[in-house]
Design a protein with these regions (language model features):
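Acidic/hydrophobic-patterned starts of short beta strands in beta-sheet-rich repeat architectures
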Residues: 12-21, 70-79, 141-150
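Beta-propeller blade termini
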Residues: 2-11, 61-68, 122, 130-139
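Blade-edge motifs of beta-propeller repeat domains
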Residues: 1, 32-58, 91-129, 162-171
Length: 171
């Protein structure tokens, strides 16, 4: 997989932001300035967005339909080939859904990104592909949605929800 780096006018000065293609989106890195040594400084990546865009969760998305945030509307929680776990909030109703753009689901405060590294049966070219396949269920019977995942790491993992019904927090 190869990404192309595209310079993009920042609109603030004569310096360029960068747009770089990734598995789940195109990302914009805003130019922030220079270090004292003269190296450029860029922001953390932010997805490039499109108005009224269709839902997009990356390649080989594995969706689950579940009321993730306890508001009564069915949301989508999905894994993708990159190894990310994504949440699409339903801002509408179950009969007329209106999904927000995806948010990364976190565990322990960090976005979930499960990849095998170089210990994968498919070989080193698959090291960065997690092929995350989540199943949302109440694993421990506490009334909160938990997540069981599998993928290219060739093992199952259970992520228990230690948050609340309205604000899930996986560990």
């Amino acid at each position: 997989y190869s990404s192309r780096v595209i310079p993009y006018p920042s609109g603030r000065n004569d310096r360029q932001d960068l747009i770089i293609g990734g598995e789940a989106a195109m990302y914009r890195y805003r130019f922030l300035g220079f270090t004292p040594e003269g190296a450029p400084i860029y922001s953390d990546p932010a997805p490039v967005l499109q108005r009224n865009a269709p839902l997009y969760g990356g390649s080989l998305t594995v969706p689950n339909v579940v009321d993730w945030d306890g508001d009564g509307a069915l949301d989508i929680v999905a894994g993708n080939s990159e190894g990310r776990l994504l949440f699409f909030k339903n801002r509408g109703t179950n009969t007329e859904p209106d999904f927000a753009r995806s948010e990364e689901v976190c565990a322990g405060g960090s976005p979930i990104l499960l990849r095998p590294g170089y210990h994968v049966v498919q070989g080193p070219f698959e090291a960065s592909w997690g092929y995350l396949c989540p199943t949302v269920c109440d694993w421990n019977g506490d009334g909160l949605p938990d997540v069981v995942v599998s993928g290219s790491r060739a093992k199952f993992e259970v992520m228990l929800n230690r948050g609340t019904r309205e604000k899930p927090e996986l560990d």
